[in-house]
From Swiss-Prot:
Signal peptide: none
Subcellular location as annotated: Plastid, Chloroplast; Cell junction, Plasmodesma
Taxonomic lineage of the native organism: Eukaryota, Viridiplantae, Streptophyta, Embryophyta, Tracheophyta
Species whose genome carries this gene: Nicotiana tabacum
Subunit structure: Heterohexadecamer of 8 large and 8 small subunits. (Microbial infection) Binds to tobamovirus movement protein; this interaction seems required for viral systemic movement.
Record protein name field: Ribulose bisphosphate carboxylase small subunit, chloroplastic
């Protein structure tokens, strides 16, 4: 019985050595990094490993006088050509264009639901009916112009509705009132 205990310990030692050789070497933030480190701790903060040379920082979106309207609303307003391109993309995917407008709160706020998340409690008013059967992007932009004339102080957005899956697939602001 003692021989069986001894042989199983020898087998366990051998398998540990084999496993250690099979593990890929550690690659840290710096090429000179090694794992595990067995040296005296250096409390000088200038010697702490830094990957700062490889990081490209992006400017944070300024929250002052910059309300958030929709996803990607921090980008500049879309030009007429860009709007036309977005609507053509919407139509190419077989989605139904629909215009909505909001006269009071075009930006994100919480009214009906106080918990954070995708749903923010806003309801936009639909401009006419969804444009079922529309195949021309200029028709959609003509409706945007008509909505602008009727409600010059409203936010107007274009959504793309997939009537097969019954979901909204795209949404973007087409017009913001002056001063926003």
């Amino acid at each position: 019985m003692a021989s069986s205990v001894l042989s199983s310990a020898a087998v366990a030692t051998r398998s540990n050595v084999a496993q250690a050789n099979m593990v890929a070497p550690f690659t840290g933030l710096k090429s000179a990094a090694s794992f595990p480190v067995s040296r005296k701790q250096n409390l000088d903060i200038t010697s702490i490993a830094s990957n700062g040379g490889r990081v490209q920082c992006m400017q944070v979106w300024p929250p002052i006088n910059k309300k958030k309207y929709e996803t990607l609303s921090y980008l500049p307003d879309l030009s007429q050509e860009q709007l036309l391109s977005e609507v053509e993309y919407l139509l190419k995917n077989g989605w139904v264009p629909c215009l909505e407008f909001e006269t009071e709160h075009g930006f994100v706020y919480r009214e009906n639901n106080k918990s954070p998340g995708y749903y923010d409690g806003r309801y936009w008013t639909m401009w006419k009916l969804p444009m079922f059967g529309c195949t021309d992007a200029t028709q959609v932009l003509a409706e945007v112009e008509e909505a602008k004339k009727a409600y010059p102080q409203a936010w107007i957005r274009i959504i793309g509705f997939d009537n097969v899956r019954q979901v909204q697939c795209i949404s973007f602001i087409a017009y913001k009132p002056e001063g926003y």
